Amino acid sequence: TAIYTPMQAFLAAKCGASYAAPYVNRIDNMGFNGIQVTKQIHDIFKNNNLKTEVLAASFKNSQQVLELCEYGIGAATIAPDIIEGLVKNQAITSAVDDFIKDFETLTGEGKTMSNYDLY
């Protein structure tokens, strides 16, 4: 169920909806704080022992996803470019490149753990 307000989420949950999908960025565009609204919905469900799960949607950046995960909202529908923002990190990329280079120095260029013969 597409959700824009906490009361709408509460009513959907009382009617038996399995999931309520607050559209975070669209809520922001309506002049409200989409992250806060989503957290309020999560709290309403928990405080009222409702089985409906929050399925957050419509993100504009990876920080929004991370903030909701830190709050305990782990279900989300996320665009590929936002997912890339969650996993892309230059320090990690550099470390992986260094590990690969070190491994290839020991085993030969293009070798991986799956195609390296120990014997």
Protein language model regions, located:
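Shared catalytic-loop signature of beta/alpha-barrel
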Residues: F45, E53-C69, T77-V87
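Alpha-helix-loop-beta-strand connector modules within alpha/beta enzyme cores
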Residues: I35-V54, D98-M113
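Short His-Asn-centered micro-motif
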Residues: T1-A2, A57
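Flexible C-terminal active-site loop/helix
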Residues: T77-Y119
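Phosphate/pyrophosphate-binding betaalpha-module
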Residues: P6, L11-K14, S18-Y23, D28-F45
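Conserved active-site and cofactor/substrate-binding residues in soluble primary-metabolism enzymes
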Residues: F32, Q36, K60-Q63, S94
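Glycine-rich phosphate-binding active-site loops on the catalytic face of alpha/beta enzymes
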Residues: A2-I3, G16-M30, G72-I92
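Catalytic cores of alpha/beta
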Residues: T5-C15, K60-A75
